[in-house]
A protein has these predicted regions:
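A metal-dependent hydrolase metal-coordination microenvironment
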Residues: 2-176, 180, 187, 194, ...
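Substrate-binding cleft/loops of secretory-pathway carbohydrate-active enzymes
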Residues: 186-199, 241-245
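N-terminal acidic, glycine/proline-rich low-complexity segments
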Residues: 223-226
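Short acidic/histidine-rich active-site segments
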Residues: 229-245
Length: 245
């Protein structure tokens, strides 16, 4: 029997990190300091606190020589459907077909109005990029503790255009982008296949594996590559601190 080849070279420097996690700054259960301590204790070298639609930069507080924080956020756009949106939105919004909300406004809307269905979602990371990326963003670069608006599409959308618009807007703020958990988000391959300029797709999401057995997204990555889309992949735990580490 041929021995299994090693997946990684023994040469060079290798670091373990997590690009997708949440704390009490969105819907996680631990503080950033508690979460950072847990990851350090388990041999990680870096983490991105990717709060929902809320950019944070905790480098000055939590960075260490052996553990670094990647500033970022998990930004969202949604397609919602209803037989009748009249009375829920202003006429100009209904005519335009979309509106922007903060995360808090969306939650209040959801709790108040039950006559709609959340049909699809795009969750895209913006992770603060290189000096060159930040310089190109100029005054648009993200500031600390910044809420990011959520675009809500009513009854229909051009899926790939919605995702491209969100990714491009994050890049204009000095970030590189990733596309997260497409199966959990209920998107079709046509909604993401032609995305351009996205660094990587999340091909494995451990949290959604545990939640609903829908965290293995390699079919999306493979289809995008077959179609000629230039995109890498990554795996994450999407930790919300809900159980034993």
């Amino acid at each position: 029997m041929k021995p299994v080849e090693k997946m990684f070279s023994e040469k060079g420097s290798w670091f373990k990190g997590n690009l997708h996690s949440h704390t009490v700054n969105s819907d996680g259960r631990l503080t950033p300091a508690q979460s950072a301590a847990y990851y350090r204790e388990h041999g990680y070298s870096f983490i991105c606190f990717s709060e929902h639609d809320y950019y944070t930069d905790l480098r000055k507080i939590l960075d260490r020589d052996d553990f670094i924080i990647l500033p970022g956020l998990e930004a969202s756009t949604y397609l919602i459907t209803s037989d009748d949106f009249s009375g829920l939105f202003e006429p100009e919004v209904l005519q335009r077909g979309y509106c922007d909300m903060t995360f808090q406004e969306l939650m209040a809307f959801r709790n108040k109005n039950v006559n709609f269905t959340l049909k699809k979602a795009h969750h895209i990371h913006g992770i603060l990029g290189t000096k060159e990326m930040r310089a190109a963003a100029g005054e648009n670069v993200f500031t600390v503790n910044q809420l990011y608006p959520i675009r809500i599409y009513l009854n229909q959308w051009d899926g790939v255009n919605a995702a491209q618009t969100l990714s491009d807007s994050l890049k204009q703020k000095g970030c590189f982008t990733t596309y997260n958990h497409p199966i959990w988000s209920r998107v079709d391959i046509e909604d993401v296949r032609d995305l351009q300029g996205v660094w990587a797709i999340e091909c494995y999401n451990y949290d959604t594996v545990n939640e609903c057995a829908e965290g293995e997204d390699t079919v999306f990555w493979d289809t995008m590559l077959r179609h000629g889309t230039d995109i890498s992949c990554f795996a994450s735990d999407d930790n919300h601190n809900g159980g034993t580490f």
